[in-house]
Amino acid sequence: MSRRDDRSDNLICSFCGKSQEEVKKLIAGPTVYICDECIELCNDIIAEESKLEEATGPDVKKLPKPLEIKDVLDEYVIGQKQAKKVLAVAVYNHYKRIEAMTKPGEVEMQKSNILLLGPTGSGKTLLAQTLARILKVPFAMADATNLTEAGYVGEDVENIILNLLQAADYDVERAQKGIIYIDEIDKIARKSDSPSITRDVSGEGVQQALLKIIEGTVASVPPKGGRKHPQQEFLKVDTTNILFICGGAFAGLENIIQQRIGVKTLGFGADVKKKIEKKAGELLIGVTPEDLLKFGFIPEFVGRLPVLASLTELDEEAMVQILKEPKNALVKQYQKLFDMEHVKLKFTDGSLVAIAREALKRKTGARGLRSILENAMLDIMYEIPSQTMVKEVVISEDVIYNKEKPIIVYESVAESA
């Protein structure tokens, strides 16, 4: 293909034939030239094909296997090995089920929505977000404490679907294969395990309202959010293939499990029940649907969340790993910020342990790590951009425990010359 215009000896684009004078940029290859306009057109075509691929949901042939899904989860979430395996298998089977439903005569497979149980800051939300990122599907989050049943002041359950629709850029097809994470689901348990005879606006009533969209229905979603009104146009979204992941700390559930697994003993003067002392996280691993019923969930709601995954409380070692090992680890993020100022940032091992211990003391789990770091780093991040000749900043445990200033290493005159 010609690279020059024979008449004017001008360089031309090998694809559209425009000369270098007609375009902003002409990029040379081994035997051809391509202009900026053709590059932009190619990018548009690739973007459109990518959107089309996402609209149909993950291709089962290209769907990561459970082992591969867990490997990627390991890059972002520390620990929780069993929960990751449960999630990887459940998500893989969910999208295989969608593929099977498109084939006539196939066995009808029930949807496997997921219930995550674990203390605050153990990684429930991060696991759900990472799953959506791996599968390249729209993702939305909702807080169960804000939900009310229809007719009461609060957020309608349909607004959860609206959030997913917004994440999918109002592409209904894409939204219908997305993932919704509902946090604080334990807060909508009714106050006792006996049926309610009065209105429970934020408890059993919300469970009933969530039932339909979780099991699969065509929801009428107001495109602008808020309350429905007769003059408003509705978007129809089928929730049959939306994967729902619900999460909560379930404080007090361990007591119900403890009572169930208590060992009865016989004999004069013996205890009626001998309690087996275990950590709450260890007890949650053995949770059963019956325990959830006693906690305050209605049978139909428990039945719609057949996959149970328990997360354990993070210890000091896990907290330190979270600070430095994941792809998006906080230490790496701060080091990148300092790198942009051409300054090396170093955390001593003692400082990482101090941060972890402070987070454990606050009982906020991994989510408390950032606020501790922000407080410790505020002054130095304020000063460094205005300083010259700074080579390295060292964060020691004294910075965390005693609010001392970080160690600043300056360049020598010889180095700066």
Curated annotation (Swiss-Prot):
Residues 1-54 form the ClpX-type ZB domain. ATP-dependent specificity component of the Clp protease. It directs the protease to specific substrates. Can perform chaperone functions in the absence of ClpP. InterPro entries: AAA+_ATPase, ATP-dep_Clp_protease_ClpX, ATPase_AAA_core, Clp_ATPase_C, Clp_protease_ATP-bd_su_ClpX, ClpX_bact, P-loop_NTPase, Znf_CppX_C4. One of its GO terms (molecular function) is protein dimerization activity. Coiled coil: none annotated. Zn(2+) binds at residues 13, 16, 35, 38. ATP binds at residues 119-126. Keywords: ATP-binding, Chaperone, Metal-binding, Nucleotide-binding, Zinc. It comes from Geotalea daltonii (strain DSM 22248 / JCM 15807 / FRC-32). Belongs to the ClpX chaperone family. Component of the ClpX-ClpP complex. Forms a hexameric ring that, in the presence of ATP, binds to fourteen ClpP subunits assembled into a disk-like structure with a central cavity, resembling the structure of eukaryotic proteasomes. The keyword Ribonucleoprotein does not apply. The gene is clpX. SUPFAM superfamilies: Glucocorticoid receptor-like (DNA-binding domain) (SSF57716), P-loop containing nucleoside triphosphate hydrolases (SSF52540). One of its GO terms (biological process) is proteolysis involved in protein catabolic process. CDD domains: RecA-like_ClpX. The keyword tRNA-binding does not apply. One of its GO terms (cellular component) is HslUV protease complex. This is ATP-dependent Clp protease ATP-binding subunit ClpX.
